Amino acid sequence: MAKKDGVIEIEGGVVEALPNAMFRVELSNGHKVLAHISGKMRQHYIRILPEDRVIVELSPYDLTRGRIVYRYK
């Protein structure tokens, strides 16, 4: 998988599931962000539940929103 320039990848835990495949994620540094599932995870029907450990990609332009790119097993 190609690495994207400028994105910040950080680990966190899902706090709550919101409508429209959105999730509130608490990052390892204590911040809470709003995150959605990446397209590949949606394609492969990967389910995310509260208390799952995930990796979130954050854009440097808006650090309050992110994309969930990986769920730990």
From Swiss-Prot:
Disulfide bonds: none annotated. Coiled coil: none annotated. Its main location: cytoplasm. GO terms for cellular component: cytosol. The keyword Chaperone does not apply. GO terms for molecular function: ribosome binding; rRNA binding; translation initiation factor activity. Gene3D superfamilies: Nucleic acid-binding proteins. Residues 1-73 form the S1-like domain. It is found in: Cytoplasm. Component of the 30S ribosomal translation pre-initiation complex which assembles on the 30S ribosome in the order IF-2 and IF-3, IF-1 and N-formylmethionyl-tRNA(fMet); mRNA recruitment can occur at any time during PIC assembly. Keywords: Cytoplasm, Initiation factor, Protein biosynthesis, RNA-binding, rRNA-binding. The keyword Protein biosynthesis applies. CDD domains: S1_IF1. One of the essential components for the initiation of protein synthesis. Stabilizes the binding of IF-2 and IF-3 on the 30S subunit to which N-formylmethionyl-tRNA(fMet) subsequently binds. Helps modulate mRNA selection, yielding the 30S pre-initiation complex (PIC). Upon addition of the 50S ribosomal subunit IF-1, IF-2 and IF-3 are released leaving the mature 70S translation initiation complex. SUPFAM superfamilies: Nucleic acid-binding proteins (SSF50249). Pfam families: eIF-1a. This is Translation initiation factor IF-1. Belongs to the IF-1 family.
